[in-house]
Amino acid sequence: MSANGPAAEPADGGRAVPAGGGEAVPAGGGRAVPAGGGEAAGTVVAVVGPTAAGKSALSIALAHALDGEVVNADSMQLYRGMDIGTAKLTTGEREGVPHHLLDIWPVTEPASVAEYQRLARAAVDDILARGRVPLLVGGSGLYVRAVLERFEFPGTDPAVRARLEAELAQAGPAPLHARLRAADPDAAASILPGNGRRIVRALEVIELTGAPFTAALPDPSPYYRSVQVGVDLDTAPLDERIALRVDRMWADGLVAETRALAAQGLAGGRTASRALGYQQVLRFLAGELTETEAHQETIRATRRFVRRQRSWFRRDPRIAWLDSAGSGLVADALRAVRAAAR
């Protein structure tokens, strides 16, 4: 389950990304012209929505129906070895559907939305060039928008960043979050008060650009022809599904997986260490929580995260929302895709 919030900050795009891991994404640039046909040819299909709502299952069904390939848009499934806690589909569960941008970074690599954008667009362009349909699938809202929309990333200033990080280390995130709330209430509402790294980035962008951080979010003008299908459930059944999912993760070995990743530097990973489930287990391993407390806090934190995901996605009127509990989910999703592709 991704804990990189739905409005994660734009990061600098200069960091090198390892070439290995997962399924290779061919290099490329620009938007390729589709070489083949199909009813959704030339259209990027995004499957979005909150954690545990059923995005992965729907994406597999759509990929089979549309001759598609999945491009991951879950910020934590980018990390190698973070499998159980992110509900990453196994090879068998992918049912032969090619998946791109899984397992590309070590857990010590800080997230970069700019690097993700570059890699994801290369994957999308390659899929389109082969006449197939790209399915952009995940609950990391900014990652989805950074691919689908025209989005230039603000620069960085090492001196400004260092000064803000020094303030964070000395005073903690609360006064910085209060400053952000005064300068940009919308940004403050989307960033948790304890998430110092994202608060620092937002304040840095405001200082460098003289504009609200939210002004740096994607321009809604499209980069690709696309359709966004959102899947969701009523709160009560989704809350129950989250609890069952966390129970299953514990049974499947989340503690052992986290312990193995801790040996690879997970606790020092600025992004990966904040992933839901993993951060709670790390606290258990450090003696800060009992295992029962870590388990229950994972459920509570995931439910809170789902509320923020909903708030992010529901602001976008272009998303066609579907009830993932409905018996006609796949047929309804295909109708939405076909209508947009006409």
Swiss-Prot record:
Single GO BP term: tRNA modification
Coiled-coil blocks = none
Q: Which domain of life is it from?
A: Bacteria
Region feature (Interaction with substrate tRNA): 74-77
Describe, as the record does, how this protein assembles with itself and its partners: Monomer.
Please give the family membership noted in the entry: Belongs to the IPP transferase family.
Q: Which PANTHER family match?
A: TRNA DIMETHYLALLYLTRANSFERASE
The organism named in the record is Salinispora arenicola (strain CNS-205)
Residues at which ATP binds: 49-56
Q: Which SUPFAM superfamilies match?
A: P-loop containing nucleoside triphosphate hydrolases
Q: What does this protein do?
A: Catalyzes the transfer of a dimethylallyl group onto the adenine at position 37 in tRNAs that read codons beginning with uridine, leading to the formation of N6-(dimethylallyl)adenosine (i(6)A).
Gly residues biased stretches: 19-30
> Broadest EC class?
transferase
Write down the InterPro entries for this protein, in alphabetical order.
Answer: Dimethylallyltransferase, IPT, P-loop_NTPase
The GO molecular function terms of this record are: ATP binding; tRNA dimethylallyltransferase activity
**Keyword terms of this UniProt record:** ATP-binding, Magnesium, Nucleotide-binding, Transferase, tRNA processing
Q: What is its EC number?
A: 2.5.1.75
Disordered: where is this region?
Answer: 1-30
Cofactors needed by this protein, per the record, are: Mg(2+)
Name of the protein in its database record:
tRNA dimethylallyltransferase
Listed binding positions for substrate are 51-56
